[in-house]
Amino acid sequence: SLLLCFAMLCSMALSLAPQASADGSSEHWVAAWHGSVLNAAEDSQAPKAISSISSLAASGRGTFRIQVPTQLGGKDFRMTLTNYYGTGSLSVGKVTAGLQGSEGLSGQASGTTVTAKTSNGKSSFSIAKGATQDVFFSFPNAIPEGSSLIINIYCTSAKKVRDFALTGGSAWFQYGDITSDKNLNALGNAANLVSINNGEGDYNLLPLLQEIDVKASADTYATVFIGDSTITNSIPNILQDNLQKNGVHNASVVSSAIKGNELLQDGAGKLQGPLEGAALTTRFQMDALEVAGVQKIFVKIGANDILHPLLPDLKEWFDGSNTRPDGYVPTAEQIIGGYQNLIDQV
């Protein structure tokens, strides 16, 4: 079944029918956190972050530490790492997960760290360019909803990393294997990216991490917010809080929103374009429909399709110029057709 509700211009809600577990069990994987992975290419707005990682990892070896909240509690977790855009195959020496400690945002609580492994039990592995890798970890006891996780990814080829989500947590990078260290002794928030001009927003790049799922009861599901900068904020968290305050504990609310994202065309502009993501009609499958346990999707998109062609620094990307020969200024009919495309995909 499909329920559509157009609440305002460029906004709609889609409701998917519940899906049974693949193995027929009473539990299934449900997203507790999600990030839309982008290409932080050298010629994008992200060269500072890339060069910082390269300089800190002189030998290519270093640890990414990522702090993210989980919207669902549980014991057994699955984490998806990506290498869609890296400059080559990535070698990962170790991945650990633990609870955030009380001594700062990047600290991990003593005695909570566990090692994540692939489905065949390997703690070290490679991720081919263009591929993903799932790793699994379990805590001795179930952790409560709203817990903050500290994820450590020790990468022996860190200079090749180009996959980053832009929102939903905080990240640091430090030379060497510090996966078991309680605190960072040489704090390097190298994955922070400040806008190069006014109005583009600041980011905290989250490397390699696309999704964290938890094994949950059959009636638990994920809600996805997907769209542009109008929902890269606290709106998903506010909904999550309101649900929990009203006794709803079997639903997560995760975000697939990207600042500057458009419905019909990939990001415009040489510097900011790669960090505005693929057209929503292109990324909808991966960033919404394939999110584990998804049953409800809120879409807020279309404003940038209208506004970007009017901006002096971007207009040439929409007039079929040499900058982007296939760029065009969308009509109302084309935008409506884009919404219909999303409905058809559902």
Regions found by a protein language model. Name each.
Residues A20-I226, I231-T232, K245-V248:
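N-terminal secretory targeting modules
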Residues N341-V346:
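A structural motif corresponding to the C-terminal end of an alpha-helix
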Residues W33, T63-I66, S89, V95-G104, ...:
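Conserved SGNH/GDSL esterase-like catalytic core that processes O-acyl groups on lipids
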Residues L4, M8-L14:
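Hydrophobic core
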